[in-house]
Amino acid sequence: MAVNDTLADMLTRIRNASIVKHDIVPVPSTRMTRSVAEVLKMEGLILEYQDQGEGKDRQLLLTLKYAGRQRRPLITNLKRVSRPGLRVYANRKELPRVLGGIGIAIISTSQGVMTDRDARRAGVGGEVLCYVF
């Protein structure tokens, strides 16, 4: 099945896998999904990610992270903000705060994909890809 928005597909797969407490989630491997996975790993929301396969069959295997004995997922909600039909951009002064700073916004900037906090520190704006909390 062809997917037009690989990032939305990735977020949906993570959301569904965390609800049923799966450890590993396969997502399509693109530069954007790898960059978002790197940000999630740096923020401590996933354990790791690995590239697997060749060509069109390349997959990114994300290892989700859970807390406590009840295995509560660290990622409780993911929301796609900018989408192919309606792009959302924010300059450095308009960068959103997610849940008053508890969550993160993932921003695609001229310096790469980063969190809203990193973008504020770097003084750059960009496309608001998604919210994670």
Curated annotation (Swiss-Prot):
Matching PROSITE patterns, A to Z?
RIBOSOMAL_S8 (PS00053)
Any one GO CC term of the record: cytosolic small ribosomal subunit
Q: What are the UniProt keywords, alphabetically?
A: Ribonucleoprotein, Ribosomal protein, RNA-binding, rRNA-binding
Write down the Pfam families for this protein, in alphabetical order: Ribosomal_S8
Q: What's any GO biological process attached to this entry?
A: translation
Q: Which domain of life is it from?
A: Bacteria
Q: Which SUPFAM superfamilies match?
A: Ribosomal protein S8
For this UniProt entry, the molecular function terms from Gene Ontology, in alphabetical order, are: rRNA binding; structural constituent of ribosome
Q: Does the keyword Cytoplasm apply?
A: no
Q: What does this protein do?
A: One of the primary rRNA binding proteins, it binds directly to 16S rRNA central domain where it helps coordinate assembly of the platform of the 30S subunit.
UniProt subunit comment: Part of the 30S ribosomal subunit. Contacts proteins S5 and S12.
Tell me which PANTHER family the record gives: 40S RIBOSOMAL PROTEIN S15A (PTHR11758)
Name the family the entry cites.
Belongs to the universal ribosomal protein uS8 family.
HAMAP family, alphabetized: Ribosomal_uS8_B
- What is the recorded name of this protein? Small ribosomal subunit protein uS8
